[in-house]
């Protein structure tokens, strides 16, 4: 709800800041313009997931012993080699896990988009969770809604199995 107020075209602080800085002359209706609405929703979804992703990555990187970094530097490894030969093999499963969580988070993100745009303008932010909700509660086609939800659930389970293979892979450095 806060973002809806911040992005409001006439009184929102985002438009006021952009005008004061001189980036725009006229107010932009971020949530009412199909050119902006989806990008704004994607950005806000990213902002919701970002702190959790940083926490996961920092925990994955804290597992790497400092001695390994020092040993690679003594051996003359460049930062690129340290990244490709030390950090990515150890943090790779966590990156894969974060990717999977991001996909699940995005597929299940109903409330943000519904509160901001309700799937509009011109269906530019009309996502699968909103379709499932509208089929069930606006059109009262519960069977179709359940079928769609089952398909999304099956897809997420299949993705979970694929990503799971990389989560539990034994890492040797």
Per-region residue spans from a language model:
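A structural signal for multi-pass alpha-helical bundles of membrane permease subunits
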Residues: 1-173
